[in-house]
Structure formats: C-alpha cells, structure tokens
Amino acid sequence: MRYLLIVITFFMGFSSLPAWAMDCYAEHEGGNTVVIGYVPRISIPSDGKKGDKIWQSSEYFMNVFCNNALPGPSPGEEYPSAWANIMMLLASGQDFYNQNSYTFGVTYNGVDYDSTSPLPIAAPVCIDIKGAGTFGNGYKKPAVCSGGPEPQLSVTFPVRVQLYIKLAKNANKVNKKLVLPDEYIALEFKGMSGAGAIEVDKNLTFRIRGLNNIHVLDCFVNVDLEPADGVVDFGKINSRTIKNTSVSETFSVVMTKDPGAACTEQFNILGSFFTTDILSDYSHLDIGNGLLLKIFHNDGTATEFNRFSQFASFSSSSAPSVTAPFRAELSANPAETVVEGPFSKDVILKITYN
C-alpha cells in the first residue's frame, strides 16, 4: 500500500533532555490518555519505494491538558513535549528499528517526525514549577509562564495528529515473514523527555495497533486525473446567485492495472482528498473567500477531507481500468461574506491500497 499524491487545483473566477514528571490528558484533567490508530488489512503495491507512506491514520483534532509538573531542568519552567518514540523491543529482544522493513512516525501539527530520528517538539506553552532551581519552595516572580505574580499551573493547547507507517526499503525487498509487535507507542505527551513504555498511565499517548496486517502485493495501478492537468475550473461565478444556489463541476480519477505486473490477487484502492487548510467540517473546505468546497462520490454521498474511502476494486479477472467520477461543489459560507475576485485552492489526492 503506497500513497500516490496528486494535486487537484480548484479555480474560480473570483538535543536529548532529562525526564521530568508531568501529567497530560485529552481535553481535561482525568481525560483519555490512550488514542489508538488501527491498521486494517492493507496491501503494498509491488512498485512501492523506500520512504513511501503505506498507511496513515485519520487526523485527530483535540486539546491537550497538562498539569502536575515537577521541578524541571530550567528554573521555573517545563515544556509539555511530544516525542517520537525512542525504542521498542521485539519479542526476540532485537532493537525495534532493526527490522529494517518499516519506519513508524507521526504527523504533529502538519510536520512529519520519523521514529528513527526522535526529536523533542516543544508546545508553545509552559507550566510554572514550585521549587525549581534556585527558587527554593516558591515560584520565580514574575512567573515565567504566566508572566504575572500568579503561577500558571496547567495548560491547554490544540493539536492535530496523524500516525503513519513508511517503507524503510523498496517493497520487493521487504521481509514478508516479519512478525511485529501488535502495538507501538508513536507519540507521548509529557515533560521534556522521550516517549516510552514506562509510567505512561498519566501521559497522553497515540499508538499504532495492528502492525501485522500489512501485505505486499504482486500488482500496482497507475492513477490519472480527468481533466489531465488536475484543474477543476468553475469559470465565472455570480457573487449574488452563489448565495442561494451552489455551482458544480465534475472530474474523475482513473485507475489502471500496470500491464507488466502479475496482478493475481484481489485488492481495493482507497482515496483521500487531503488538505492542511481550514475545514468548516469534515465535508466542507473553507476556500477563504466566503465559499465552501464539497466533493461528492458518483452515488451522491459526500467525501470527507483527510479521510479515506473506497475508489475501486480489482482482481485477477477484473477489467484493467476503473474510473471513479466525482462532483466538486461550491456554496456560500453562511457565516461569511463572499469576496469577489479570482481564487484557487489546492487539494492533494492520496491513493492507498488494501
């Protein structure tokens, strides 16, 4: 299963640190501390290349709440941090990363962090700590984090998280007999330290589960867009009528089995329209000019941005090519004023296999 990235443009005529204790939860104190991304049975195309993302979870949007910080390495402050995991041992006792077939990681606030290069990610907030450094049993005044006389003893900050798996080598070199642990801690929110398997009961963790559901295929498909340039042009839009009537244009995704591949197995093609821009909800992308973009499947159901849905199914006896038609719709955002002038928006089409 490999991600193929295609850009669709919509046009319209208008260093390692010591470990210090801190509790972190989802949303509020005592909230959830475990988020699991389940890997379904997925398939990797035979032309998969080293570094390709073969699985990516849905995006998780949430607030992280942290408190109960103990004295940290710097007087008066300790940053809640998210680290890519440092190490996990296989049952055989080998270093987890030495399996050399897959790399695990996390996309944190839009930036990828591979497990092979763990780096601290400092949140833009901190907690004042009693008795840190030279301040005895009190707090530094003014407090470092609050900036005032009263210390800041807890923080809440928003995060966007996706978990992923990459190929560490070309698909045709992957060890097909490899057995992995069922669960992997990819991301942990805590004080300035690395993620790990100990003392995580009060540390919010994001985990990948189902690592042995990965299968290498003997086939792959070529993906094309119609129109071929990937531009969906809405032409000129009347700023008055768009307030009451939506406008639509169609495009298609064409998937064709490579004629040189064996293709003896059954597999499905999943697709996701991906964006890092603002979503009004999972089905509506904010264009930024008072309009919203929505994409529909051929059966009339709306797609959800940044989430995968089935585009096609192939088998040894199926037709060599499948076309998936879509309809892109623009409508007025009821909460904003429509701004006249030319605009465009890029959306990335991600293709994967299972």
From Swiss-Prot:
A single GO BP: cell adhesion
Keywords: Signal
Xref: SUPFAM superfamilies: Bacterial adhesins
Record flagged with keyword Signal: yes
GO cellular component terms, semicolon-separated: pilus
Transmembrane regions listed in the UniProt entry: none
Signal sequence region: 1-21
InterPro entries: Adhesion_dom_fimbrial_sf, Adhesion_dom_sf
Keyword Signal tagged: yes
Family: To E.coli YbgO.
UniProt function note: May be involved in a fimbrial system chaperoned by YqiH and exported by YqiG.
Name of this chain's protein: Uncharacterized protein YqiI
Gene: yqiI
